[in-house]
């Protein structure tokens, strides 16, 4: 919704499940810091592979998929521990930390660097943490910590801003397909 209202500079997500993408966050507004499962690449030659067939090979056979081009190993486009984050993360963060006028931090442990450092890097005056636990230093008079469930706080904030109907419409777009235990956006197959 923030994107639809022209209020989102960028959404940085540590999740690899792609739910932000399915929720309709535009590619130019979304940084999936640790990658996603929507695509896969050969680690030797860089050839892209069908993500669904890679997933099936891993899940059904318990084996590492082979590249059809060079025979190398294919992995989902996710960042494993010890691997570098995508260049796009670093490039966008350099400008975003200067341009943001408000930082919303939601549902995170802030345990994994370099994403954990973003709240301290951002140069804006106000930061709001929606989280079960206080995971960052709160600056008196500048920051706000809202303990509890993120969904509850988002609903309350939308009500205060007069966006409750918009939130209900957005929630209706995303459905859970229990047969696959997979989230799908409206209109996607």
Regions found by a protein language model. Give the residues of each.
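Conserved catalytic alpha/beta core of Sir2/sirtuin-type deacylases, generalized to analogous enzyme cores
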Residues: 1-189
């Amino acid at each position: 919704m923030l994107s639809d209202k022209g209020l989102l500079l960028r959404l940085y997500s540590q999740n690899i499940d792609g739910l932000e993408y399915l929720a309709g966050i535009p590619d130019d507004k979304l940084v999936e810091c640790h990658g996603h499962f929507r695509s896969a690449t050969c680690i030797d030659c860089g050839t892209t592979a069908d993500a669904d067939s890679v997933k099936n090979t891993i899940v059904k056979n318990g084996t590492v998929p082979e590249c059809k081009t060079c025979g190398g190993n294919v992995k989902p486009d996710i960042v494993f521990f010890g691997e570098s984050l995508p260049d796009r993360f670093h490039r966008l963060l350099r400008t975003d930390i200067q341009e943001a006028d408000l930082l919303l931090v939601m549902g995170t442990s802030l345990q994994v660097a370099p994403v954990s450092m973003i709240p301290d890097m951002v140069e804006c005056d106000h930061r709001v943490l929606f989280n079960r636990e206080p995971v960052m230093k709160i600056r008196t008079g500048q920051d706000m910590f809202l303990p509890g469930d993120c969904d509850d706080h988002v609903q309350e904030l939308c009500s205060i801003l007069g966006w409750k109907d918009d939130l209900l419409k957005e929630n209706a777009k995303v459905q859970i397909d229990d047969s696959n235990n997979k989230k799908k956006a409206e209109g996607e197959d």
